[in-house]
């Protein structure tokens, strides 16, 4: 009996070290960023069982076998559709401004199409204005409505949007709604999901959370896009979820969420439509390619329109493109660079680019919320402040609520707005969308919004920052070490 237990003990020990060695080898062979690899190895060797389970759950990008097969299967038809779109040469911009030229070339070569011109674009910064405009457009819809949101929280004006969408479905408009399973858990637990389906709306719970499949697909891979397309001509995107700020997370202690949305008319809706069709096919297996370009692209005034490129990121889309786009935009800055984001945990490359821009004389400002709904990200963000301040970057802490806007403005002409936070999750994991706009008029509108944010912010004083308590510095460094995993 003693011999038996001895053999079992040695087998357990051997299996333990084989498992650790196997996971270690897998981490090293994945060619991931060094800080990320080191953070994972530290967790695994300090807390082996916890670390191994965590790594197998969220350490690698698993879309899931069925979704991965759908993603591969959809690309031949999607590629053909994109080639057909290229035949509509009149919608594509032939030239871009000097500050935007490199970024637009990058997007064209990586995504296969150039930026589209002739779009009408309006910035909306008030949640009531966004929802009222959306309700009007839904009421005027003639053919189809497609929506995707990370969060749909019942209550307030969000219910009015839901009512208008159900009314549209009842009068024969083809309505599709895709919501992230984790972000919209309150919606799927409410009567609204059944009510919408009964009204004729196709409601899809994207990336459904299932603990039984935790090792087969990353549960923290989320559908983070916020998009609305109406009649293949009107489109919305930006940072705002389908929530009424007066009813959303009121117990979080951060104030109302402050967002920005863009309402567009023109060919950009077609580009966003193909992104939505890919998401829909990956999730449901059903192919819903937008109508042929020559059918849905309506006349437009080229002289007064905006040139826009759409960047889609996430599994199945060009890898690392949004990260490359942010780096390219940052290095293109010559006069000033303004960034707004609720969550700031940049890659080493992006941090270096921002600091380098400030050190070569660019006026660099980053606007962050003073209070954050994520304790982990809040502390991790602070770990970067010293390096930014030393480089000459201005850090503004917004005091008017939780600033949720994701925007970048370069030299008043090149703008990026969308759903991407400046953190690892948005840059390399989630399904996201970003608009790249080459236009001084839109740049002026975005600058006015950012100036308003600055007027409601407090500039971080570098002299006071270095005097913060020791315990805060220790906490910041702790979270900084694990920032590659956040």
Swiss-Prot record:
Location (main, coarse): membrane
Report domain PLD phosphodiesterase positions. 219-246, 399-426
GO process annotations (BP)? cardiolipin biosynthetic process
For this UniProt entry, which segments traverse the membrane? 3-23, 38-58
Catalytic machinery residues? 224, 226, 231, 404, 406, 411
* Keywords for the protein's UniProt record, in alphabetical order: Cell inner membrane, Cell membrane, Lipid biosynthesis, Lipid metabolism, Membrane, Phospholipid biosynthesis, Phospholipid metabolism, Repeat, Transferase, Transmembrane, Transmembrane helix
Q: What class of enzyme is it?
A: transferase
- Cite the EC number: 2.7.8.-
Q: Which GO terms describe its molecular function?
A: cardiolipin synthase activity
Q: Which domain of life is it from?
A: Bacteria
Tell me the protein's name. Answer: Cardiolipin synthase A
- Which species is listed as the source? Salmonella typhimurium (strain LT2 / SGSC1412 / ATCC 700720)
Q: Gene encoding this polypeptide?
A: clsA
